[in-house]
């Protein structure tokens, strides 16, 4: 009787339903788990973490100053550090702290990150005037603001420099949006129009209808588009001149002063001086920027908008194609 009941249960298809449901549940759990791991590991990247200014004293070497953001800390065996060639004393705790510091200033130092031994950091401070400058190229710059210049002339320094810098960065970002519209939309439309005229002329030529009147009409349209292009080119030249007008002078950890064109600055902020709610607002603005902006620096910085749009569209199209066969 039990054998017949078991056979009937298998024939009813119920085991397949349970197996399919279990497989779907496992897939959903794995997907949620993967998204959770990505969120925990990745979303913290957008938080404006405090910046440190400290002295790094390696035994037997001249000390040097370190400015940057602590990204990661880990406990490593003393012997491991010693075997790596670091001058670690024989006596001491079994484990030492190793910290990954984002020092930025890649155009000056060659590296964005560096590993240091936490026990060798001394005089660690978080001065509120320490700033992070997110640039369109070469990554972040960490240091202190000295002054703001317009056409090479100092217009603000000291305490007045920071609000002036914020106003100039906002102005540059507005100009960048105008430049993007002109270069991608307006010039793109003109190029498309010129290509349409070329193809239409070729079509008339193949059909034997490219007479003097048709040629005159095509040339008239082409001249109109070229005139529009010259006008846009003049506007672009003017915008580029305004875009490159301002600059800032900053001082790095070692006291070296460098000049940064504000046209190359995306954001400038002082995380040590920001309150909790200010940091939360900045965090969500960075997340939105990541989702909506175009990439830059060979897809290593900026946003992911084109990629995420293509991925979502591909998923939807594949779902519509596959579902009828499912």
State where each predicted segment sits.
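Transmembrane alpha-helix signature in integral membrane proteins
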Residues: 301-325
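Membrane-topology segments of multi-pass transport proteins
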Residues: 1-21, 25-33, 40-298
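Residue-level signature of catalytic and energy-coupling elements of molecular machines
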Residues: 35, 326
């Amino acid at each position: 009787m039990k054998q017949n009941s078991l056979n009937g249960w298998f024939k009813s298809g119920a085991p397949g339903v349970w197996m399919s449901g279990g497989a779907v549940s496992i897939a959903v759990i794995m997907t949620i788990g993967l998204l959770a791991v990505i969120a925990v590991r990745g979303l913290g990247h957008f938080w404006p973490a405090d910046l440190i200014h400290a002295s790094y004293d390696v035994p037997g070497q001249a000390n040097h100053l370190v400015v940057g953001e602590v990204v990661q800390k880990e406990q490593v065996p003393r012997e491991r550090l010693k075997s790596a060639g670091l001058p670690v004393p024989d006596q001491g705790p079994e484990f030492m702290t190793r910290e990954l510091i984002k020092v930025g200033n890649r155009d000056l130092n060659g590296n964005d990150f560096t590993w240091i031994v936490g026990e060798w950091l001394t005089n660690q401070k978080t001065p509120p005037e320490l700033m992070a400058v997110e640039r369109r190229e070469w990554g972040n710059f960490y240091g202190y603001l000295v002054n703001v210049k317009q056409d090479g002339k100092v217009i603000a320094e000291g305490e007045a420099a920071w609000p002036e810098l914020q106003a100039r960065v906002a102005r540059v970002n507005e100009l960048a949006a105008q430049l993007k519209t002109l270069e991608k939309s307006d010039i793109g439309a003109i190029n498309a129009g010129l290509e349409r005229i070329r193809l239409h002329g070729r079509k008339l030529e193949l059909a034997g209808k490219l007479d003097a009147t048709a040629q005159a009409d095509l040339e008239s349209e082409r001249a109109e588009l070229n005139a529009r292009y010259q006008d846009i080119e003049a506007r672009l030249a003017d915008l580029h001149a305004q875009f490159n007008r301002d600059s800032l002078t900053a001082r790095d950890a070692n006291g070296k002063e460098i000049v940064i064109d504000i046209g190359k600055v995306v954001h400038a902020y002082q995380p040590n001086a920001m309150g909790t709610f200010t940091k939360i607002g900045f965090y969500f603005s960075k997340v939105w920027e990541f989702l909506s902006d175009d990439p830059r620096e060979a897809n290593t910085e900026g946003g992911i908008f084109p990629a995420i749009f293509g991925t979502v569209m591909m998923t939807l199209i594949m779902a519509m194609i596959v579902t009828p066969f499912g």
